[in-house]
Each structure stands twice: as C-alpha cells, then as structure tokens.
C-alpha cells in the first residue's frame, strides 16, 4: 500500500501527512515510515487514540458518568497484550479515578479495555469499523485545525521512553505539522517495565517483516 500512497497521494500532495489505521498498527506505521521516507512527524498511527477512547468508556461505565467527563490514556502497543492503560493518571472532573474506584474495580476496567477490541470483533463477527474511523477522524481534526491536542498515537521513537527504532503509542501534541511534540510523562517502575515489554513485542513483529524482506 505504500507504493499506492507514493504514486497516488505524494505525487500530487508531497506534504501529505499519513494517518495509519491498518493492523498490526505499530508495525504498519513503522513500515510506512521506512518505506516512504517521509519525516517522522508526518507518519502517525492512531492506535492509542482508539484504545484511550475505549478506556474512557469503561471508566465512565464504572463511574456512572459521561465518557466526556473522564480523562484517561493508553500507551504502548496497539494489541490486547501490549497496551498499557494508565489507570494511575485517569481523572474524573479533576479527581483521580483511583480515589473513586476500588483497586479491584480499576483492574476490571483495565482488563476490559485490553480485550475491548477482541470482544467487539467476536460480537460483530468482523473487525470494528466505526470506532477506528472515529478515532482516525479525531486525529485528523487536530491536525487540519491545528488544535494542538494531546493524543496518544503510534509514533517513531529515537530514545524517548528509553526506546528507539520502532513506532509505538505515546502521548503527542498534534497540529498542522503532524506530530508537533512527543510528550514524555513520568512512568512508575512498573509502567516502565510494561512499556519495555510492549516495545519488545513490537520489535519482534517488525523483525518478522524484515525476515521476509518487507523492510
């Protein structure tokens, strides 16, 4: 698909910004970056955006409120076993969710978030379409209107969060130039370990592409 993008999009719009929605999200974002040769700020995977929206939904269900009243973020790989919902940082109207829900309930929310995509696919009998489309639109909106929103997206790291040469979900500022800034939040030792494990899994998938000559 990178050949099609180059011949049908970059040919006529050389400054285009690519938002990747295809799975495996992080590896497809990495493949796009390496194949197209675009600046890293113009290749964005929307996985973390979708995962964070699902996290906020499950938090709102547990709290009995509107999802728009909840702030929550998911980082790491876009996959059932690689995503990292940051329950510690989730808030409801400025209050830490950890002070409103029991540890057991928060664990349930995190577990539901991590299997949310697979559960939906099983119920639908096919892949999700509305939520990924809405998440992609949310990313594009911040770019075309230069809204500078803080959104978790799969982006190329060069030392941030202790990782390099991969695309993985982290919070970024999105504006007219695409990725305006990668935001490094302070992680706990446990969160750092989970992020490192997530990155290792993404590297393994990338390695499989290299083995077949796709990279």
Where are these regions (language model features)?
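Short, small-residue-biased leader/transition segments that mark boundaries at the very start
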Residues: 1-4
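Generic structural marker for isolated residues within well-ordered, non-membrane alpha-helices
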Residues: 6, 29, 56
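A short helix->loop->beta-strand "cap" motif at the edges of active sites that frequently abuts
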Residues: 10-17, 41
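Active-site-adjacent beta-strand anchor residues
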Residues: 18-22, 129-130
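Gly/Ser/Thr-rich loops at beta-strand to alpha-helix junctions
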Residues: 20-29, 47-51
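Conserved nucleotide-sugar donor-interacting segment of glycosyltransferase catalytic cores
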Residues: 32
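C-terminal substrate-binding/catalytic lobe of Rossmann-fold NAD(P)-dependent dehydrogenases
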Residues: 36-42, 50-215
């Amino acid at each position: 698909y990178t050949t099609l993008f180059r011949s049908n999009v970059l040919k006529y719009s050389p400054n285009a910004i690519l938002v990747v929605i295809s799975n495996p999200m992080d590896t497809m974002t990495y493949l796009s970056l390496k194949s197209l040769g675009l600046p890293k700020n113009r290749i964005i995977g929307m996985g973390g955006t979708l995962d964070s929206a699902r996290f906020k939904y499950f938090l709102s269900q547990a709290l009995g409120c509107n999802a728009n009243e909840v702030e929550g973020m998911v980082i790491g790989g876009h996959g059932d076993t690689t995503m990292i919902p940051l329950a510690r940082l989730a808030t409801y109207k400025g209050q830490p969710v950890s002070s409103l829900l029991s540890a057991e309930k928060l664990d349930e929310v995190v577990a539901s978030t991590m299997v949310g995509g697979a559960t939906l696919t099983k119920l639908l009998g096919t892949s999700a379409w509305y939520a990924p489309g809405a998440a992609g639109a949310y990313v594009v909106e911040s770019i075309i209107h230069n809204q500078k929103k803080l959104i978790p997206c799969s982006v190329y790291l060069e030392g941030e969060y202790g990782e390099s040469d991969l695309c993985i979900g982290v919070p970024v500022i999105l504006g007219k130039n695409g990725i305006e800034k990668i935001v490094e939040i302070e992680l706990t030792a446990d969160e750092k370990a989970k992020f490192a494990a997530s990155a290792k899994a993404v590297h393994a998938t990338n390695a499989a592409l290299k083995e077949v000559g796709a990279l």
